Design a protein with these regions (language model features):
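Short beta-strand/loop motif that positions the catalytic acidic residue
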Residues: 45, 51-53, 57
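Short, conserved loop/helix-junction motifs that constitute active-site signature segments
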Residues: 43-46, 71-72
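Conserved alpha/beta-hydrolase catalytic His-Asp/Glu region
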Residues: 1-44
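Conserved alpha/beta-hydrolase "acid-adjacent" motif
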Residues: 58-64
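Catalytic active-site module of serine/aspartate enzymes centered on a nucleophile-bearing elbow/loop
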Residues: 75-107
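Generic recognition of short, well-ordered alpha-helical segments
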Residues: 40, 63, 90-94
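Active-site-adjacent alpha-helix of alpha/beta-hydrolase-fold enzymes
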Residues: 66-75
Length: 107
C-alpha cells in the first residue's frame, strides 16, 4: 500500500541495510534451518502474550499467526486487515489500541 510505505520509511530501511553486520545477519537468518526444538518450548510459556499480525504479511504468512495461537497457551491474537509485515508502522493506530487493551487486562 503506497499510502503506508513512504519514501522516508523506504530510506530508513535502506539505511539499516548499510549498517555494519545488518545485511549479513539478515541473510544468515534466512539460511538458518528451522529450529523446532526452540519453537516447541513456547508451549510452556504461561505469561500472557499478545500476537499482532498483518493479514497481508508476505514475509511470514498469516497462517503462522494461527499456529502461534494454537501452540502458545495464554495468548491474544489480533489480525490486522490491510496490513503487512510491520503492523506498528503500516497501521500504527490499529496496532496501538489492542496493545493498550492487552496491557490493561493482563496485569
Amino acid at each position: 500500500d503506497t499510502s503506508k510505505v513512504t519514501d522516508t520509511l523506504i530510506e530508513r530501511y535502506f539505511e539499516l541495510t548499510l549498517r555494519e553486520g545488518n545485511r549479513k545477519a539478515f541473510v544468515d537468518r534466512l539460511k538458518m534451518p528451522k529450529d523446532t526444538i526452540t519453537y516447541n518450548n513456547i508451549k510452556h510459556i504461561q505469561q500472557p502474550t499478545l500476537i499482532i499480525w498483518g493479514a497481508q504479511d508476505l514475509l511470514i504468512p498469516v497462517e503462522n499467526a494461527y499456529k502461534f495461537q494454537e501452540d502458545l497457551p495464554n495468548n491474544t491474537l489480533i489480525i490486522l486487515e490491510g496490513t503487512g509485515h510491520t503492523p506498528m508502522e503500516e497501521s500504527p493506530r490499529e496496532s496501538l489500541e489492542p496493545v493498550f487493551n492487552f496491557l490493561k487486562t493482563s496485569q
